[in-house]
Amino acid sequence: MKLQNFFIITALLFTLQSCIKSEAPNAEADILTCEVDGNLLIREPIIQNTEVKLYVTDLDKVKNLAPRFTLTQGATISPTSGTARNFSTPQTYVVTSEDGNWQKTYKVSCLTNEIIAHYHFENARITDGYYTFYDTSVSGQEIAWSSGNAGFKFTNSNAKPDEFPTSQSESGYRGKCVKLVTQSTGVLGKTFGAPIAAGNLFTGSFEIDLFTPAKSTHFGIPFKRKPTHLSGYYKYKAGEKLTDKKGNVIPNQKDKCDIYAVFYEVTSQVPHLDGTNIKTHNNIVLMAQLTDKRETDNWVQFSIPFKTIKGRSIDTKKLKEGKYSLAIVLSSSEKGADFTAAVGSTLYVDEMQLSYE
């Protein structure tokens, strides 16, 4: 039996290696770093698969901005690195691999710390085969939510949009809502030590880390105000069997959902928090945590206060400089980052609101 398992895992790894090799040219068309002159940025640029986000102090100063990029070896970019452009609206760049066979289009956006405090979950688009949620500010600035859907696609490439852990439902408290479902990641997910994927939605970004999956979630976006409450509506049903990371059933226990928010200081050593430290890191100053996690067939209203972590406080100077981040996190399984969860656990959330000073 052990020998048979060895051959199965070997075959899976060989298949995965073949997939990676076949897509390697595309990996040679990446933006690695981005720089701009002066003190315009309040945070290091956030570079995702096809997007670069630049958090800036003033949008009036981006009308003649000339960002410089470093690329994967031999790749070229159009327009060329250092070209001055008007970033009052997002700009597009095309990166071409060294052999000329692969191209990747990037959207580069300049964002301010404009606050969006009402989340209706009406706005979602299908990107790369799965739902992506976003909100739009009064001025038209778009802020995207993140999820682990990209990781699920890696293990379940044939899934339809509604079969991903994070999707949109028509059955909201008012209109549409976000639907989060804990899913099995199949044989390939188990191979990498990630047998389940909890449905999640959070402020921040998601970058796949195959070796430490819990570090794939980069929680938080810049926030220059003091948050006081997070409120909204939820419905929740736990899956039938709670299992651990190895797939063993945990008797006499049920899964629970999780809704919480964390306000923390950002430093050069701690640019973000992830699934390994989002509730425990010493940089956390304020935290709001849902404690009433009961299962319910009807919508339940919640309002959770931000509480100060003992011995910590907000530095007003750093707050004005944008040195704090706010992470709002929704999950269908509270221990999903540790892969202890029940397949089928389902959380609906709607009409959420952030209050602040």
Predicted regions and their residues:
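Extracellular carbohydrate recognition and processing domains
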Residues: 268-319, 342
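Bacterial Sec-dependent N-terminal signal peptides
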Residues: 1-30
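Extracellular beta-strand ligand-recognition surfaces/modules
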Residues: 249-260, 301-346, 352
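Extracellular carbohydrate-recognition regions
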Residues: 111-156
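Short carbohydrate-recognition loop motifs
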Residues: 168-188
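Extracellular-facing segments of soluble proteins and assemblies that are Gly/Ser/Thr-biased and enriched
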Residues: 188-269
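Extracellular polysaccharide-targeting segments
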Residues: 122-123, 266-281, 314, 333-357
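Beta-rich interaction/scaffold domains
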Residues: 19-120
